[in-house]
Amino acid sequence: MERPIDGFIWLDWVVEKLIEKHGVDPEEAEEAFFNKPYKVRKASSGKYLLYGRSSDGRYLFVVFVWEGRRVKVLSAREMEPDERRYYGQK
């Protein structure tokens, strides 16, 4: 990531949603920010979309916002097929 990350902010309800609804562990979502290659796109309302992989090789789609130099994860799930195609493009 071009911007240095000084940590992550996790809200309890987000962690619950990731685990219960999407089956994604917060540590997996964090790994996607450091495992190359990854892609980041700016979305609306100051949100960013990260397309990356966990250390176990899961293809993850992560929605986040910057809070200073920390990342606040809003959602994370496995990529859909069209997102995997986008991620695979150079």
Regions flagged by a language model, labelled:
Residues M1-K90:
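Ribonuclease/tRNase effector modules and their secretory precursors
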